[in-house]
Amino acid sequence: MSFVDEAKIHVKGGKGGDGCVSFRREKFIEFGGPDGGNGGNGGSVIFIASSAVNTLLYFRYNQHIRAENGKAGSGKGKFGAAGRNRVVEVPVGTQLYDEDGNTLIADLNNIGQQYTVAAGGRGGIGNAQYKSSTNRAPTYFTYGTLGEEHCVLLKLKIVSDVGIIGMPNAGKSSLLSRCTASKTKVSDYPFTTLEPHLGVAYANGCELVLADIPGLIENASSGAGLGHKFLKHIERCVILLHLVDCSLPDIVSAYELVRQELKLHSQELAGKQEVVILNKCDLLSEGEVREKQKLLESSTKKEVITLSMGDELDSLIVFLHAQVKKAVVTEPSDTSFDPFLYVHYNKK
């Protein structure tokens, strides 16, 4: 399945049904009076954030979204039926912009969050509503109004607990595959990952959502490589998991290059809590690994975790889960109020 994270669509609410002009006609009732009913309201186009969908692929083939029109009123005081709403599921993390992409309209970053993109029109009024003491037989009515109509730009920013970052071929996809049931493509060459992947890891009662994005290279924040398009997908992760390939001749430069690209893209992103892992340690001797670990710790001023292909990952998952919980508590208000995160980490 293709990963689609942007789509421009046209949405239109349903038209309201027209009011009715009608008069009561029954045997032995000479002046029955007006009995035209009102028209029904048009349906609305509503987007709802759902965990059941992961991309905006649906909108590649459905660029025109319309709700149902309301039905017209009829005689005997019958009101027209309201048009059915068009409810469309979108991935959690979907943002709605105006047609030019300059103004943010809505940000659906919580499961179940809804937004009415195009409201339906109001139903027209039948002639029965215009009866008065001075006008016993009104013959006028109103038409239903048109529904709202917009062109909107949808952008997706993935919501995850842990964003896995690093240079190309650092082992990000392999780690995601080992931690989760995600069937990501894994090969020994750069840019194996061409689109973001999500996976859910479980260990000792802990549940963790991880996102793997394409590797970052120099000038990724300016569009080089694949990173520029997908850097936005880790903006909403709670913490960063930075993988550094132990076999590289200059691991400090590799680490600093990725950090620099994060800073150039967003200071907020660069300021997220980071866990550093020295990966592929099975390719070097224990002495070489210890030497590189100390070198990286000295440069980053952070504790560096070493990881080999055969290592069990349950303890790592539990550790990351604890770091995420700690970050959620101390996160600024922009994310700390997120009900999804609250339920996710307080359901135990």
UniProtKB/Swiss-Prot annotation:
Residues that coordinate or bind Mg(2+): 173, 193
Keyword Nucleotide-binding part of the UniProt annotation: yes
Positions contributing to GTP binding: 166-173, 191-195, 212-215, 279-282, 310-312
GO molecular function terms noted in the UniProt entry: GTP binding; GTPase activity; magnesium ion binding
Record-annotated Obg domain positions: 1-159
Gene Ontology annotations for the cellular component aspect, listed alphabetically: cytoplasm
Residue ranges occupied by any OBG-type G domain in the UniProt entry: 160-329
GO biological process: ribosome biogenesis
UniProt keyword terms in alphabetical order: Cytoplasm, GTP-binding, Hydrolase, Magnesium, Metal-binding, Nucleotide-binding
Segment forming the signal sequence: none
EC numbers for this chain: 3.6.5.-
Cofactor(s) the record lists: Mg(2+)
Main location: cytoplasm
InterPro entries, alphabetized: G_OBG, GTP-bd, GTP-bd_Obg/CgtA, GTP1-OBG_CS, GTP1_OBG_dom, GTP1_OBG_dom_sf, OBG_GTPase, P-loop_NTPase
Cell compartments where the protein resides: Cytoplasm
Family recorded in the similarity comment: Belongs to the TRAFAC class OBG-HflX-like GTPase superfamily. OBG GTPase family.
Record note on quaternary structure: Monomer.
Annotated NCBIfam families: Obg_CgtA, PRK12299.1
Function: An essential GTPase which binds GTP, GDP and possibly (p)ppGpp with moderate affinity, with high nucleotide exchange rates and a fairly low GTP hydrolysis rate. Plays a role in control of the cell cycle, stress response, ribosome biogenesis and in those bacteria that undergo differentiation, in morphogenesis control.
PANTHER family registered for this protein in UniProt: DEVELOPMENTALLY REGULATED GTP-BINDING PROTEIN-RELATED, MITOCHONDRIAL RIBOSOME-ASSOCIATED GTPASE 2
Protein name (Swiss-Prot/TrEMBL): GTPase Obg 1
Lineage of the species this protein comes from: Bacteria, Pseudomonadati, Pseudomonadota, Alphaproteobacteria, Rickettsiales
